[in-house]
């Protein structure tokens, strides 16, 4: 970060709030392809960029020279050999500009976040980035709550909404105009594509810029929770560092007053709930509360009206589901979670009298949904839709050890991700499918039968699919008759994204 401050001469840029001159600096485009930045401080890790001839310094210098020319953007747009300004490999210069712009708009947020963490003396911890850290929180909190609400955050229906969101953070008008030009040019060239496909394609074309815009949009959608929490609770929440809090959010109260009533302070008490908890991953969030169903319905209508008034987003009622925790399971991060009532009988004796007391204990349970997981394996060509293993097509030049390593790595990653499951029977079936699919793949390669191939490999195939979790559990937990290894749950804090096979959305 010290090097970045030296590069940008941040004092001058912070004073004038100008970001667009940075597009004329070569190091910005180098930072766009620098592995050391790890994508973005505010977004999820990016994939590694390849240092090919497209990102050479010669092309960057030509780009900057062209940008110094008058009406360079108009010339690039009217070029007959180009189909658009954003997201196409044929337009190399415009692609480089959009990548450099993605780095520039992150600079104010990245620096403010780092300064805020240093002032509050918050230590950097990679464990806090793990999505598996959500489940220990569920174990501690959900057993005391009554209702849960599944919320799908709506997508922005127009690019101007994203620009208006950033206007409150970035005071550089030329940069906002350039962002508006990027988005409108892309949206107009893909007007016949559906919204979901359009956003998906744009996220692949410029993943860094898309993640930044999407994170800012999601934060705006959920900022109402931060505001109401601080207004209705005497205990201030600690700084999480996911996004910087906005002080101008109080200006949105006008919309809330129209929706909720004439006096905001009088209606605020309707949403006071000291036992309300909120978690989110990407566009799906969970809102759990100890309150009544009436309170949860108020939150539902409040969110719908807030999104409609402030973002002009129409959120369908079926995007917010309210259910009781005691008789409903909710799907989140590849797990089917629920709160089960486990009854136990306790015998108590006082002098000559004895009593039998039946107590119910709430316990948080997480299981692996087998049907969606088999569907993911079928989509990846490991089995059919019924779960019957099939041979996986691989290149013929791969050796047997490489095929074994690939199957074993897939099985270990999947078992590692689902290590927190309360019941491991589903994982045993998945391992069986992957193991038999591997055997069918190798037997097909050698033009042999599966039985003969399994007999020849024997323990080697079993050892390849023996996960580290099973080895660790055998060393930690004693082998006693009462011990059930398939009930032990382990949450690993090195997982920062959902497994591809476990993502059934």
From Swiss-Prot:
Gene Ontology biological process: mRNA processing; RNA splicing; tRNA processing
Localization per record: Plastid, Chloroplast
Cysteines joined through disulfide linkages: none
GO molecular function, one term: RNA binding
Keyword Plastid (UniProt): yes
Keywords noted in UniProt: Chloroplast, mRNA processing, Plastid, RNA-binding, tRNA processing
Recorded superkingdom: Eukaryota
Chief place where the protein resides: plastid
InterPro entries, alphabetized: Domain_X, Maturase_MatK, Maturase_MatK_N
Keyword Metal-binding among record annotations: no
Any single GO CC term annotated in Swiss-Prot or TrEMBL for this entry: chloroplast
Region forming the signal peptide: none
Family per record: Belongs to the intron maturase 2 family. MatK subfamily.
Described function: Usually encoded in the trnK tRNA gene intron. Probably assists in splicing its own and other chloroplast group II introns.
This protein's name: Maturase K
